[in-house]
């Protein structure tokens, strides 16, 4: 077995974000405002179930404990349940999560659970149905809310909800969000709006630092929790009067990258060392046969030697990320 993935800055990597499609049926203003547009034609299409099985097996041999399936919208894959099961085959992977817009959650969550899914993140940027429609381009607010209820009914102890923090859109709705999570085991994660190649104007108009919310939470008696090694980048806060939690993801904060523990593989098999990195390292030619696993592990480990210390977002560097559906956010 190869050694634990570690980069030149002594960061260890336990967490893989694996995109399985860049297709999405929502048109969120901060991601795909004009809807999904196919990229360059790729005869191989998106990663197959067997390719997913091989790449996650290689990462697990290198110490990966958590795999998050992302998109686009991953549940648009007809074989999504089989993909979950393929990852679940590997006992070294302790957590299998999905980030979803939630529109198929009510219908399919029990099947996903039975296939091996252990955690769910749902994107909800407003608790007002009309504003939700305006942000996403889809009139599916109640369907998504029913999906979250279905996840709890299916036995998920906690559901994470991702909310992109936007000035003059939802930043003033903190009290509404807090009332929603008070009786529910929801970890509500406010994510700072990030500048992408296609979203510079939106960023200038709507970016708000998560520190504004952080200061308000601390003022109200919320307590900062200690981060676990396979956790994502959120700073998590709890309060004795609330069943739910608040998470803040602030990529522009000083030292945000110091605790990076995650790598990304795109839906066409490229390894991305950073959400805002350049190019990517092609792994797909080593996902063809089971016998290539040692070579695949070696290429992943070698690529990690090139991971930079920080994303340089502060300098306005958005890398190749034209929109966040490209490599799964």
Curated annotation (Swiss-Prot):
Transmembrane segments: none annotated. It comes from the Bacteria. Keywords: 4Fe-4S, GTP-binding, Iron, Iron-sulfur, Lyase, Metal-binding, Molybdenum cofactor biosynthesis, Nucleotide-binding, S-adenosyl-L-methionine. GTP binds at residues 17, 68, 99, 160, 262-264. Its cofactor is [4Fe-4S] cluster. Pathway: Cofactor biosynthesis; molybdopterin biosynthesis. One of its GO terms (biological process) is Mo-molybdopterin cofactor biosynthetic process. [4Fe-4S] cluster 2 binds at residues 257, 260, 274. Gene3D superfamilies: Aldolase class I. Its EC number is 4.1.99.22. [4Fe-4S] cluster 1 binds at residues 24, 28, 31. Pfam families: Fer4_12 (PF13353), Mob_synth_C (PF06463), Radical_SAM (PF04055). InterPro entries: Aldolase_TIM (IPR013785), Elp3/MiaA/NifB-like_rSAM (IPR006638), MoaA (IPR013483), MoaA_NifB_PqqE_Fe-S-bd_CS (IPR000385), MoaA_twitch (IPR010505), MoCo_biosynth_MoaA/MoaC (IPR050105), rSAM (IPR007197). GO terms for molecular function: 4 iron, 4 sulfur cluster binding; cyclic pyranopterin monophosphate synthase activity; GTP 3',8'-cyclase activity; GTP binding; metal ion binding; S-adenosyl-L-methionine binding. Residues 8-234 form the Radical SAM core domain. SMART domains: Elp3 (SM00729). Binds 2 [4Fe-4S] clusters. Binds 1 [4Fe-4S] cluster coordinated with 3 cysteines and an exchangeable S-adenosyl-L-methionine and 1 [4Fe-4S] cluster coordinated with 3 cysteines and the GTP-derived substrate. Monomer and homodimer. NCBIfam families: moaA (TIGR02666). Catalyzes the cyclization of GTP to (8S)-3',8-cyclo-7,8-dihydroguanosine 5'-triphosphate. PANTHER family: GTP 3',8-CYCLASE, MOLYBDOPTERIN COFACTOR SYNTHESIS PROTEIN A. Belongs to the radical SAM superfamily. MoaA family. This is GTP 3',8-cyclase. It comes from Klebsiella pneumoniae (strain 342).
